Each structure stands twice: as structure tokens, then as C-alpha cells.
Amino acid sequence: MDKSDTDWDGFDPEAREEREIGREMVSKSTGLGSVVAHFYRGEMSVVTTWRSRLDETINWAVTIISAILIYAFSTEGNHVILLTGMVVIAVFLGIEARRYQAYDVYRARARMLQENLFANTLDPSQGVEHRDWRRELSEDYRNPTIKTPYVEALSRRLRRIYFPFFALMLAAWLFKLMAFSTQPVLETAAVGNVPGFVVFGVVGLFYALITAVAFWPRERQSKGEFSKVEHGEWKEAE
């Protein structure tokens, strides 16, 4: 058997001296600290890149929503443009949920390092947050996996960003139907040969669906960055 295989068989990433590698980085002068610094810098660079991609999606959504609203109320055009706006927002939501899944992969790695390496380096007395953090991180680099289910990604982006967009578009659509026509609302809501009550039914089902996705209770899988609010208490001198 190769000597390296023998050494690896004896390696236990959950052993105290291995999982608390942050203590070694402070107490001993090794090249490990330099390697980890570059490694962490690279991870944060990827996190920042994916964060900017999320922001780009939001910026495009805001721009298109603004254009649709301006066009819808600057002419006597059909209310269908606002229904189209709802579809456009849904498309952007789907794109952003996919991007959020990728973003969370790299954010989870960065948080794993922050919680178990850097926090332990600053205060070794607290120990690590995850006993097998090195094994988990190693496995994730060998076999990268999505950490957040797609439905949860949709839910988080809906609550944070897109639900207000949908609410704004719904309010604009209803206002357009009621304020810019002398006909009954159900007649005004008709789209071509599709009766108004069918249009209302489809819109109602769609909003019921996104409300359920956004607010249905579920166990969180994504890696959060903030555990609680302290409002500056942490930096007060004793």
C-alpha cells in the first residue's frame, strides 16, 4: 500500500487538532495561512460576482416594469400590457431563483470558512461550529451540489424582491380596469375571445400560487449570513 494512502487512512478531519486548524494558523508560522488567505479571497470574489448577477436581474426587472407602467398609463391602450408585465416579472423571478441557487453554493462555502476557521482563529476558546466542517467542505469541492431547493429559492426572492413587484403590477392592472373604462370591470378585463371572468380567475390563481410559494412555512436549507439582530451591541465597550 502506498504511504500516502496509509497517511490518509489515519487522517480524521473531525479530530480536535484537525477541525480547529484556526488555532494552528495563529500559534504556528506555516504556509497554510497564506494558502487559506488566497483561497478565501477567491471564494469571496466568486460570491461577489454572483451577487452582482442577482443585482443585474433586479435592475433589468425594475427598468422593464417602469417602461410597462409608463406605456400602460400614457396611452389608452389595452390592459393586456399589464398582464404581459406580470409574465415578464415571473420570467425574471425564475432566472433570479436559478442564479440564487448558484450564489448560495459559494456563499455557503464562505460561511463555512468564516464560522469554523476565521472565527476560531480570533477566539479558539469557542471551538468550531461544525465538527466535520473540513470533511463537508472537501466533499463539496469534490462533488459540488446545489444547497437550496428551487422552490425555496423562489420563495426567498419573492419575499425579498419580487412579491412587491407583483403587487404593484396587480394594483396597476385593477386601476386600469376600473378608472379608464365606462364598461363593467368583467367586460373590460376580457382578452380577445377570453371572457373577463376567466381572465380574473387565471390572475387570481396565479397570485394565490405565488403567495403560497412565498409564505408557506418550510425548513430553510440555504445558508444564512445573519443569525439575529443586535443593533450595534456587539461593538460596545465594556
Question: What spans do the regions from the language model cover?
Answer:
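Membrane interfacial helix-start motif at the N-side
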Residues: 42-56, 103, 142-162
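Cytosolic-side membrane-entry/anchor segment at the start of a transmembrane helix
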Residues: 22-75, 211-219
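Hydrophobic core segments of alpha-helical transmembrane domains in multi-pass membrane proteins
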Residues: 81-89
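Solvent-exposed, non-transmembrane helices and loops of integral membrane proteins
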Residues: 8, 13-32, 111-148, 228-237
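Transmembrane helix-loop junctions and nearby membrane-interface residues
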Residues: 70, 74, 93-100, 174-181, ...
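A hydrophobic membrane-anchoring alpha-helix module
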Residues: 145-238
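Inner-leaflet juxtamembrane helices
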Residues: 89-138, 212-228
